[in-house]
Amino acid sequence: MNTMENKIIKSKKAQVSLEFSFLFLAILLASIITISHFLSQNFTKDDKVISDVENAAKTAVILANSGYNGINPNVTLIYGGISWSGNKKNIYIYISPKSYITPEIKNFIVSYIYNVTKINQSEYNITVNP
């Protein structure tokens, strides 16, 4: 009788564990769906483009500082940030010190951003230090 009770208790524990796992899975799935819905409703394609441009601009400044593609800024360039117009089609990249940003460096940064992000150049205008 004692072994029979142990088997019943063990099976009940397993049943509770299985039910808890299904409950946890259902809560996790509902959370993922809610977050996904929230993000898709609150962030547009333009928001993603701005995020991609910002990441590419940071990388371009790092590459320019390292002498990539023969660029020699003579000082350490500092990525200062990004801003954009109301319609999010004009994107401005700020790099300092401004006096050391040559047209060659500007062209490299802008072309690097367009090449990496694959955004439409006729739709989005990127300017360095406007």
Swiss-Prot record:
A motif (QXSXEXXXL) lies at residues 15-23. It is found in: Secreted; Cell surface; Fimbrium. Disulfide bonds: none annotated. GO terms for cellular component: cell surface; extracellular region; membrane. Keywords: Fimbrium, Secreted. It holds the Pfam family Class_IIIsignal. Residues 1-14 form a propeptide. Its main location: secreted. InterPro entries: Class3_signal_pept_motif. It comes from the Archaea. The N-terminus is cleaved by the prepilin peptidase EppA, which recognizes the class III signal sequence. Coiled coil: none annotated. Contains an amino terminal motif QXSXEXXXL, which is part of a class III signal sequence. This is Probable pilin MJ0835.1.
